[in-house]
Amino acid sequence: MEVATDQPRWMAHHAVLNGQHPDSHHPGLAHNYMEPTQLLPPDEVDVFFNHLDSQGNPYYANSAHARARVSYSQAHARLTGSQMCRPHLLHSPGLPWLESGKTALSAAHHHNPWTVSPFGKAPLHPAARGGSLYPGTGSSACPSSSHSSPHLFGFPPTPPKDVSPDPGPASPPSSSRLEDKDSIKYQMSLSEGMKMEGGSPLRSSLAPMGTQCSTHHPIPTYPSYVPAAHDYSSGLFHPGSLLGGPASSFTPKQRSKSRSCSEGRECVNCGATATPLWRRDGTGHYLCNACGLYHKMNGQNRPLIKPKRRLSAARRAGTCCANCQTSTTTLWRRNANGDPVCNACGLYYKLHNVNRPLTMKKEGIQTRNRKMSNKSKKNKKGSECFEELSRCMQEKSSPFSAAALASHMAPMGHLAPFSHSGHILQTPTPIHPSSSLSFGHPHHSSMVTAMG
């Protein structure tokens, strides 16, 4: 019978938390407090929030329970220390392993104001930072700092050694119910929270709140380890270091300088004044490329008289083989005596060291259709691929000219993270952004809803 009575209460309260209850804001309050007349009766609210006081500390009506809680807190502080935080599972109202709404609410709100997570962050939605759960506390300089950690990174309470909970009157149902609505509505898992934080433009409005809260917490908040946008693009790609900039103008100057230095040179062997590469002989004199290579390979100077050209096939028309007396061959060779022989007789003598027998003589010349080897095929394919790649690069090089790249890289110092232009590189955004970041596009609310 107890379950039957608790179920309609939970269903009614869950409907209010989901936003089905009409919201009416008090005109005289800056925070989003709701009229007490439109809230649930205090006896129904006590079903879920009877363990919290106005300071957010556990409240127990029975003195025996309070003494047990204090002794447990002191023992827990001695064991763990005031600087130890133990992560637990994130609270989400839609998880199937939560048996009842009462367990979810008690786990989500059982946090003290001095239990501060070093990774605590403000809620991402602007409505979640409108009011505070505990309006009467003097230490809450940041409105949503004391209960922002359960939204993304929840930690169990770790009380200090010298602090004990102060029992006080129960909190008014208006502020508790409003904060319950915000926390249930905007709780999310870790992956969703990180995705929203990386892409949501609302982080810039939350930065001043995080800086104010960092001075009041015993544990400092996690700093941003990614530099700002203007620091990132200062030395990475300077427009002057790209193609066509001042660095590329160094090449023609160097070439002209080398040409001017080599104008008075002359090869000491052949007297040439123009050569692709100047060399030196053993005494330090300049040689042209041809004479220098000849001297390096043969150890003597290159002869100035050109050697006689080999006799052409027409001039050797009357030549016949000394072995088989044939006059048609693809290549003339010489035997040991120096006499000309045909290709077949010369190869036979070279292989068997005897003269080729006349019975093997044939009227026609047998030729083979040589197949292209795999190595030459690979070399040919590689050269073709390289030529095709170079041709494609030349065709597509116009959009990536130096002027286009310089125009892309120039405004990167003040580029906003949500710009929709076609930049090659986008500036990284820090995890905790500074308040100086500005977002120039007015349609970020639709982006947040689409990403969520």
Swiss-Prot record:
Offer a single GO CC term for the protein: nucleus
Enumerate the residue ranges forming zinc fingers (GATA-type). Answer: 267-291, 321-345
What GO terms in the biological process aspect are recorded for it?
Answer: cell fate commitment; negative regulation of transcription by RNA polymerase II; positive regulation of angiogenesis; positive regulation of miRNA transcription; positive regulation of transcription by RNA polymerase II
Do you know which Pfam families this protein is assigned to?
GATA
* Compositional bias ranges of the Polar residues kind: 426-438
Using the UniProt annotation, give all residue ranges assigned to the region (Disordered). Answer: 130-182, 426-452
Return the Low complexity bias intervals: 139-151
What superkingdom heads the lineage?
Eukaryota
- Enumerate the CDD domains for this protein: ZnF_GATA (cd00202)
Q: Which PANTHER family does the record match to this protein?
A: ENDOTHELIAL TRANSCRIPTION FACTOR GATA-2, TRANSCRIPTION FACTOR GATA FAMILY MEMBER
Its protein name is GATA-binding factor 2
Upper classification of the source organism reads: Eukaryota, Metazoa, Chordata, Craniata, Vertebrata
Q: Which gene encodes it?
A: gata2
